[in-house]
A protein has these predicted regions:
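Short secondary-structure transition/capping motifs
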Residues: 32, 36, 74-81, 101
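Short, well-structured alpha-helical segments
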Residues: 37, 41, 62, 102-113
Length: 164
């Protein structure tokens, strides 16, 4: 199945089509804006690039791409949107709308709740799946007019992409 962005005709295959429809119904900001479907597609593509480099597969990557900004109330000023996204994920899991093992649940909750800040002392910060999620979002910061700052990236490969 494919999701097509009407705004710029981007096409991307996502596994969680029903989830996308649910997110879209509840999305409080512009679905085609800076934190909408086109951004989610780029974040997912970034997760694939990084995870292929590190030879890691995880269900968390697509879910992070779709959910990390899903509970924004404002396009730019919304410091608690990641925490709200984590709460939404817990609801989806309780309702059986998605199923993850314990380790991936912890990774996804942590990555969404903390994607705008980083506690490098937290053990989950050092998890490569979480780091790929963080870097995949941060590599797309150019969409809102900022340059990617390598000091905010967690993986060596993401840092090397910025210096290319």
């Amino acid at each position: 199945m494919k999701i097509i962005s009407k705004k710029d005709d981007l096409m991307k295959e996502f596994k969680y089509i029903e989830l996308i429809e649910q997110i879209k119904k509840e999305f409080k900001i512009d679905y085609y804006g800076d934190h909408g479907i086109s951004h989610w597609q780029r974040v997912y593509e970034n997760t694939q690039k990084l995870s292929n480099y590190y030879k890691i597969e995880s269900e968390v990557f697509e879910l992070f791409a779709l959910l990390h900004d899903s509970k924004r109330h404002d396009e730019y000023e919304d410091r608690y949107h990641g925490v709200r996204a984590a709460g939404y994920i817990q609801k989806l899991l309780r309702n059986g709308d998605m199923v993850l093992n314990k380790e991936d649940t912890e990774r996804l909750l942590y990555a969404c709740a903390n994607h705008t800040k980083s506690d490098k002392e937290d053990p989950l910060f050092n998890d490569i799946v979480v780091q790929i999620c963080f870097d995949s979002d941060r590599l797309d910061i150019g969409r809102v007019g900022y340059d990617v700052d390598p000091s905010y990236l967690a993986t060596k490969y993401a840092k090397s992409l910025v210096s290319e």
